[in-house]
Swiss-Prot record:
Extra information: Heme 1 (or BL or b562) is low-potential and absorbs at about 562 nm, and heme 2 (or BH or b566) is high-potential and absorbs at about 566 nm.
Protein name as annotated: Cytochrome b
Annotated residues for binding of heme b b562: H83, H182
Alphabetized Pfam families for the sequence: Cytochrom_B_C (PF00032), Cytochrome_B (PF00033)
Chief site of localization: mitochondrion
Length: 379
């Protein structure tokens, strides 16, 4: 009799994806982040569901409902902070996952990569709308500033902004619709993750060497399931340390003040994981130019498969490209720092230089270094 996991229509799909999946024998810990992101997504959906049971999407009661969750609901503080810090951990892993894809040339799986970029945009949108829900000062003003950016779109901009707001300012209608979208998007993201995996399993995983590994595959379980559990332990350690010791470390103190349309906070800034894009937005004096640069700072990821000119897939054996990638990482850290600083000298000029460097490294220097490496190897 055939084993049930190989014959049952449903269990067979799980088997082919997580148990008998042929996996390269040499993939490193950098390949752990995919499964960790899946766990993060599940954790966010579960904690979010419990928060939604106690939350009210109304301008008068949203702030106090969140306070009620922390004070009166059993372990409500734990659920809320696990959800807030879970988002931070989610983004840390997302950025590491993307960085791994760039370093090892995984973007050559074009469908998987492009769906991944769409996933990134969806997760960013979900996180932004989630930040608005507690209805603190930074929630309100963050929503006002970011939605206002759409008014830079020629001809239809102002109408579009009012349509998104559901009125003439960020108000009850905005909060209600943001809650609805924030609730539904993670489930759409889950469906997209399945498509992401479907395309990945069409080609099989990449590996650190960037070479074809069809001749050397091992089953996913038990080898990589155990390896992923180790990564999961580290993730839980990081998350629980944040939640239990310093839950407000990554938050903004202004968000503990209820939203007040008559009082603007001195520095409006998003959560830390959007600061690099926010710095690029602010570094361009023109509104439409800033919005375009903001969009391009993420959408530029879609150009990676087109701009790959190296004869080698991975950067493992390309020292020039490695140096440039780590320069890009340093540049992104500088942008993140600048995004959290006030708009004054010398931060303005540092932000502008870092923004120019960001696009130059990706669009000019990386393809040039790949071309030079090809020449040096006489390819």
């Amino acid at each position: 009799m055939t084993n049930m996991r190989k014959s049952h229509p449903l269990i067979k799909m799980v088997n082919h994806s997580f148990i008998d999946l042929p996996t390269p024998s040499n993939i490193s810990a950098w390949w752990n982040f995919g499964s960790l992101l899946g766990v993060c997504l599940m954790l966010q959906i579960i904690t979010g569901l419990f928060l939604a049971m106690h939350y009210t999407a109304d301008t008068l009661t949203a702030f106090s409902s969140x306070t009620h969750i922390c004070r009166d609901v059993n372990y409500g503080w734990l659920i809320r902070y696990a959800h807030a810090n879970g988002a931070s951990v989610f983004f840390i892993f997302l950025y590491l996952h993307i960085g791994r894809g760039i370093y090892y040339g995984s973007y050559q799986f074009k469908e998987t990569w492009n769906i991944g970029v769409i996933l990134l945009l969806m997760v960013m949108g979900t996180a932004f709308m989630g930040y608005v829900l507690p209805w603190g000062q930074m929630s309100f003003w963050g929503a006002t500033v970011i939605t206002n950016l759409l008014s830079a779109i020629p001809y239809m901009g102002p109408t579009l902004v009012e349509w998104i707001w559901g009125g003439f300012s960020v108000d009850k209608a905005t909060l209600t619709r943001f809650f609805a979208f924030h609730f539904i998007l993670p489930f759409i993201i889950t469906a997209m993750v399945m498509i992401h995996l479907l395309f990945l399993h069409e080609t099989g995983s990449n590996n650190p060497s960037g070479l074809n590994s069809d001749s050397d595959k091992i089953p996913f379980h038990p080898y990589y399931s155990i390896k992923d559990i180790l990564g999961l332990m580290f993730m839980l350690l990081l998350l629980l340390t944040l939640v239990l010791f310093s839950p407000d470390l990554l938050g903004d103190p202004d968000n503990y003040t209820p939203a007040n349309p008559l009082n603007t906070p001195p520095h409006i800034k998003p959560e830390w994981y959007f600061l690099f894009a926010y710095a690029i937005l602010r570094s361009i004096p023109n509104k439409l130019g800033g919005v375009l640069a903001l969009a391009l700072s993420i959408l530029i990821l879609m150009l990676f498969p087109i701009m790959h000119v190296s004869k080698q897939r991975s950067m493992s054996f390309r020292p020039f490209s490695q140096c440039l990638l780590w320069t890009l990482v340093a540049n992104l850290i500088i942008l993140t720092w600048i995004g959290g600083q006030p708009v004054e000298h010398p931060f303005i000029i540092i932000g502008q230089l870092a923004s120019i460097s960001y696009f130059c490294i990706i669009l000019i220097l990386m393809p040039t270094s790949s071309f030079m490496e090809n020449k040096m190897l006489k390819w």
